[in-house]
Amino acid sequence: VAEITERAMRGELDFRQALNERVATLKGLPDSIFEKVYARIHFNKGAKELVDELHSRGFKVGLVSGGFHETVDRLAKEAGIDYVKANHLEVIDGFLTGKVYGEIVTKDVKVAKLKDWAAENGLKLSQNIAMGDGANDLPMIKTAGIGIAFCAKPIVRAQAPYQITEPDF
């Protein structure tokens, strides 16, 4: 799974194909796995404080992820994220089927959500900031007024106008 993810983030694999291959490896796992995954995830130092600071200045914060709602939603709620879009894992009778359902969060969906959320808030795209780390984030990074490569793969660092190279805020 890690190898497939890494190759997709470097832009070597089609994201949709890579996602389906990764998810297929999860077939048969109990949905209790989400609790175990959540317990292992930690926010980068300063991430929640950054969201709080942005809110105090009147900004909205969105998270569009190629990850899964089953963990992303809980993290977003804990951090106070205003908008969330991620992939959905199919679960039947308490077990993962190895499939996703609904709209897959591709690079085009990431751009669409940036545009939707900007329009919803009466903003021009030039008034938005987008951060990402993988090839799937590049179109979104390039569409925003300020595009930032965050601890990103080389392909993203080479094309993003701004970079954050340390994981802590």
Language-model features: where?
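C-terminal cap/substrate-recognition subdomain and adjoining C-terminal extension
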Residues: 28-29, 35-169
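Long, charged amphipathic helices and adjacent flexible linkers at domain junctions
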Residues: 13-24
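Active-site neighborhood of HAD-like aspartate-dependent phosphohydrolases
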Residues: 1-10, 20
